[in-house]
Amino acid sequence: VNVGERDRGNTINRILINRIAAEATLDAAYAWVCQRRQHHHFNSDIWVLRRHWAERKPQIQSLLLKGQYSFREQRVITTPDDEIEYWCAEDALVLKAISLVLTEDWLPLLSPQCFHIAGRGGLKAALRQVADQVGSYDFFYRTDVKSYYASINHGLLMAQVEQQVQDPLVLSLLWDYLKRVVNDGGWWRSVYQGISMGCPLSPLMGALYLKPLDDRMAALGVVYVRYMDDWVVLASSRWQLRRAIRAVRQEMARLRVVPHPDKTALGRTTKGFDFLGYWVTPGGLRVAARTVGRMVEKVSRLNEQGATASRIDRYLHHWR
């Protein structure tokens, strides 16, 4: 390869990092992180970023374009209900910028039956498609992945990413995002498997990781609807359903993930099934009993913790 061809190749490969570091992309990511963290504590680093954004933006751009940007360690924040791996405001902004550009590029490549991706209609669209078609099919199979985010294999994920991304600086950032370091109250650990929850880039990575499953279902010609790691298959015959289940198991084995034993079901559609918190039958949708049970349990915990009436009201309003 002569020098001119090599330079042209490098220029093409570097277009992606230029788009991520572009002023419009960083401004959109900045607006997003400001909105998401507008109610954070006054000691939160979001306020430092907001105060110094005019000076910090060109510095971030320069670091990205030189391949010198590195993500800091994540902190673990413990709440009464969960543990949250927390990115600093600046890292969250950069991850959002990467997500904005990659989503634009990958959206046409990802299955139209994957509904959790931005612009696909979300949970309501997934439920609507299942509800509209369930009456035309006799059998269903639904499942999801046990501990999906924590189970994602970095090597298998990046093998898929590298089919779409050639920019070495972006690939380096994505490896840095995956092989992160977590600070849990002074205990430090390196992460070698799984992706981060609560990260703006993770839903897109979660969509890409199961793309082989999406493609396999499309080839079978069954009705298939996926929302993140939760999906349902509708089939006209037992033979068609068995073939789909066999394909699902084969793809999950290749991706080194396992079905959740408590969220896997199959049978006749007339008996109904639980999907995304709703009970689905040919007659329509209603909130699943398990969803109501979780709501009651949450309200009980809030009462035990001495939550104010206004906080409980906010939770119930959000739940509805």
State where each predicted segment sits:
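Active-site and adjacent loop segments of nucleotide-processing enzymes
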Residues: 2, 276-320
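Conserved two-metal-ion catalytic palm core of "right-hand" nucleic acid polymerases
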Residues: 1-166, 170, 181-185
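A generic secondary-structure boundary signal that marks alpha-helix termini
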Residues: 106-107, 257, 304
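Short, charged/polar, Gly/Pro-enriched secondary-structure boundary elements
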Residues: 240-244, 274-276, 282
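Short acidic-glycine loop/turn motifs at beta-strand connectors
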Residues: 80-81, 236, 282-283
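Conserved polymerase palm-domain catalytic core
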Residues: 63-64, 71, 112-113, 118, ...
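A short local loop/turn or secondary-structure capping micro-motif enriched for an aromatic residue
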Residues: 94, 150-151, 243, 284-285, ...
